[in-house]
């Protein structure tokens, strides 16, 4: 009489899962894949929210810089300042009234 080897437990469990336990195995795989999908979507949502917050902060910074540039432009274009720079740096002066020429456009 041939001697029987002891049954392999892992082989029996795998065979049982593939024959009798197909539906529970399929449900287990679906549950794990759904859980991984939730983790994946949560991660990407958090990344998108972080990127949106950074974009808003950059927008605030650029808006402040824009306001400062408008103020600087207004200060630099002030008439009295331009007149003072023309006299001092460029040595310009207002022409005499007899040297002014008026041009009429038709």
From Swiss-Prot:
Respond yes or no to whether keyword Cell division is given for this record.
Answer: yes
Q: Which residues lie on this side of the membrane: Periplasmic?
A: 44-106
| Intracellular or extracellular location(s) | Cell inner membrane
Cytoplasmic topological domain: 1-22
Listed transmembrane segments: 23-43
Query: What InterPro entries does the database record attribute to this sequence?
Result: Cell_div_FtsL
Name where it mostly resides: membrane
Q: What protein family does this chain belong to?
A: Belongs to the FtsL family.
Mind listing the UniProt keywords for this protein, alphabetically?
Cell cycle, Cell division, Cell inner membrane, Cell membrane, Membrane, Transmembrane, Transmembrane helix
Q: Determine if Cell inner membrane is one of this entry's keywords.
A: yes
In Swiss-Prot or TrEMBL terms, this protein is called: Cell division protein FtsL
